[in-house]
Every structure is written in structure tokens, then in C-alpha cells.
Design a protein with these regions (language model features):
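Short, charge-rich amphipathic alpha-helices with coiled-coil/heptad character
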Residues: 1-31, 35, 80-84, 88
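Extended alpha-helical coiled-coil "stalk/arm" regions
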Residues: 30-80
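Short, amphipathic alpha-helical "recognition" segments used to contact nucleic acids or chromatin
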Residues: 106-122
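Residues within the helices of the helix-turn-helix
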Residues: 126
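The alpha-helix within a helix-turn-helix
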Residues: 129
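Short, basic interhelical loop/turn and adjoining N-cap
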Residues: 132-142
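Residue-level detection of the helix-turn-helix DNA-binding "recognition helix"
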Residues: 144-147
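Short Lys/Arg-enriched helix C-cap and helix-to-coil transition segments
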Residues: 150-161
Length: 161
């Protein structure tokens, strides 16, 4: 039994087109998930800003919480207690949504990796090699960008699961 070369070529082109479509869709999904995550972080930052918590105060508070070292002078203790109440309230409100958005980014990143592998499997070896290098650089850039958007409590929450 012989295979018609034209039908084999059509099949390969169709597979490549389908893989490219899936890859493009995975890119759109990841971009959307990252935008949503950034938006949640920005909204949380705005909520803190609206309650007069500066980035410096938040960083100091996170250090105190992480190191389990509390301030010692009365004025700082009062400030810490007040900020702890405000920050904890905002954390409770936003960290669940941020964690869910991070899970969605992780899922979309995995789907992009699978779609990339599927697309590469439809290409000649030399082109696939070049695209693999590009995809690895792109995915590592995405991973670094996502890691930089994590807030301390959201990161701790994700690590517990």
C-alpha cells in the first residue's frame, strides 16, 4: 500500500496549522491570566495605599512578621499593631483571589509548554531547535515576571499547598 505524498503533506500542514492555533490560544490565555494577576496585585496595592500603608511600611511589617521579631519601643509597637490589623484585613480580602489567579497563570504556563511541544513536533528539526531556544527564553522570562509579582503572603500560601 502506498501513501499519496500530497495527502501526507496536506495532513502535516493541517497538523501544523492546528498546533499553531492551539499555541496562539495558549499564549492568549497566559497573557490574560498574567494581566488578571497584575490587576489583582495593583488593586491590593491601591487598597493598602488607601489605608495609608506605604510600600516601606508594608515591607517593614513583612520583615517583622517573617522574622517573628516585633518592635520594642511604644510608638513602633502601636504602629505595628495598627498596621497589622489593617494589613491582615486586606490580606484576607485579596490573597485568596491572588492565589487563585496564580494557579491560573501556572495552568496557562503549563498549557503553553504543552502547546509549544506539540507545535515543535510538527516542524523540521532545525526550525524546531531554534524555536525551542526562543520558547525556553520566553518561558523563563514569564516565570521570572510571575515570581516578581508575588506578594509575600501569597507566596507563603502557595507553598503550603
Amino acid at each position: 500500500m502506498t501513501v499519496d505524498p500530497d495527502s501526507r503533506l496536506q495532513l502535516l500542514l493541517s497538523e501544523r496549522e492546528n498546533a499553531l492555533g492551539a499555541w496562539l490560544e495558549a499564549n492568549v490565555q497566559l497573557s490574560s491570566a498574567l494581566d488578571h494577576l497584575r490587576q489583582l496585585h495593583a488593586t491590593k496595592a491601591e487598597a493598602l495605599k488607601a489605608r495609608w500603608i506605604s510600600p516601606h511600611q508594608l515591607a517593614q511589617f513583612r520583615r517583622w512578621e517573617k522574622e517573628m521579631v516585633k518592635p520594642t519601643d511604644y510608638r513602633t509597637i502601636a504602629s505595628y499593631t495598627q498596621h497589622r490589623h489593617i494589613i491582615a484585613s486586606i490580606d484576607r480580602r485579596w490573597d485568596g483571589a491572588i492565589t487563585a489567579a496564580q494557579v491560573e497563570v501556572d495552568r496557562a504556563t503549563n498549557e503553553l509548554a504543552v502547546a509549544t511541544a506539540d507545535l515543535l513536533s510538527t516542524m523540521p528539526v532545525a526550525l524546531a531547535s531554534e524555536l525551542t531556544d526562543l520558547s525556553v527564553r520566553l518561558l523563563s522570562t514569564i516565570v521570572r515576571a510571575v515570581a516578581n509579582t508575588h506578594s509575600a503572603p501569597a507566596t507563603r500560601m502557595v507553598q503550603r499547598h
